[in-house]
């Protein structure tokens, strides 16, 4: 299992986490917020008081798991969260942010 960065998505991680619709950033609670639009303070400063323990945009990139029109950015962006749809096996589907384990794309 890849080690998850337990810090909020700030600093160098802020831009892709906050602006990439395929980032997989789906933290919604007060204590697990990662550059959510209504919590922009997470994107600046040190991120103190902002615990990001399970945010997908803080996870390392998952290799060999991206396809579609967003393939390039998804495959190279360490904050992509690399998501896919289990039905169509289409990676980086921002409408279905589930972990991609058996994606055949980019093999």
Swiss-Prot record:
MF term (GO), any: cadmium ion binding
InterPro entries with a match to the protein in the record: Metalthion_7
Propeptide: 1-2
Signal peptide residues on this chain, from the entry's feature table: none
Keywords assigned by UniProt, alphabetized: Cadmium, Metal-binding, Metal-thiolate cluster
Keyword set includes Metal-binding: yes
Coiled-coil intervals: none
Signal found in the keyword field: no
Factors inducing expression: By cadmium.
Function of the molecule: The metallothioneins are involved in the cellular sequestration of toxic metal ions. Binds 12 cadmium ions per molecule.
Protein family membership: Belongs to the metallothionein superfamily. Type 7 family.
Protein's name in the database: Metallothionein-1
Organism name: Tetrahymena pigmentosa
């Amino acid at each position: 299992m890849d080690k998850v960065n337990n810090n909020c998505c700030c600093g160098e991680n802020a831009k892709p986490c906050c602006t990439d619709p395929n980032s997989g950033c789906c933290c919604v609670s007060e204590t697990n917020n990662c550059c959510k639009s209504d919590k922009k303070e997470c994107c600046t400063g040190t991120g103190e008081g902002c615990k990001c323990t399970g945010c997908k945009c803080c996870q390392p990139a998952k290799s060999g798991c991206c396809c579609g029109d967003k393939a390039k950015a998804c495959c190279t962006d360490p904050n992509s969260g690399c998501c896919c749809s289990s039905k169509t096996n289409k990676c980086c589907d921002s409408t279905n942010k589930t972990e991609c384990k058996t994606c055949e794309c980019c093999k």
